Amino acid sequence: MMNEYLKQYITLQKQFRETKGNPDSVRALYDFKEGLEQNEDKQAKEVLVDVYDLLDYKKSAYDLLCQIGDRSDKKTLKRLGTLKEYAENWGNHYAIPKPKTPEEKQKEKERQAQLGLPTFRYHPDPLDTGAFEESEEGIVCDCCSKTTHIYYTAPFFSVEDIEHLCPECIASGEAARKYSGSFQDDYSVDDGVDDPEKLDELIHRTPGYSGWQQEYWRAHCGDYCAFLGYVGARELRAHGVLEEVLDDPMWDEEQKEMIQESVNGGHLQCYLFQCLHCGKHLVWMDFD
């Protein structure tokens, strides 16, 4: 007899498949996941493995199945083998993101403020995108020689080999000035921004991102866009912006099909941007 956890999972899975992972279906799966995580019932944990797997929390799915799975069962052993490969190669890094509510976005801003993270107009959430990482022990910034608990991990183009930069030295422009460096190639940006100060802010005072090829920055409404993160088609659907990013004269029909087939962390990678003025979402894409 099918238990209630499995019945609910099948309903949510069907909704997720039929809507191609739209924001409501992803949010419903996350709510279900969070409830199951508080439940000690073995049947709930068995279904939680399926939810983790569907949302691409591969490491979490593997770890939990290792704990509760019957290793005398051939199906369980086969699934463990498949999940192990994904867990080792992907971890939970490419999990489908939970669409954030306005309240959650505000809490994230408050957390960044508590950490003392400067505001970057063109890269508003650099901790979430991975441009910065946190260190409990602290790391010495190469530029100011002060200990920082948040340090830069994305590209910095300079003659000298710089390992660690703190957010303050990036925001002030001191890192770019001291090392005659930049965080973004000034030729790899969209046209249409006439204000040289905006270009200076982008390349000298904004954390960059890591692309497969040369990183490229989108622009709209006469200004550079905010970089929101790394995405594939599933993430674009989860954010509810897939159709919006396809409505872009940058891409021909063949390229639009490629965007719809892109996979975060895969051979064809997309990068999500948003206009600071009208709110339109745009992507850049490249290959490994």
Predicted regions mapped to residue ranges:
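Preference for intrinsically disordered or flexible, low-complexity segments
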Residues: 17, 22, 26-35, 43-50, ...
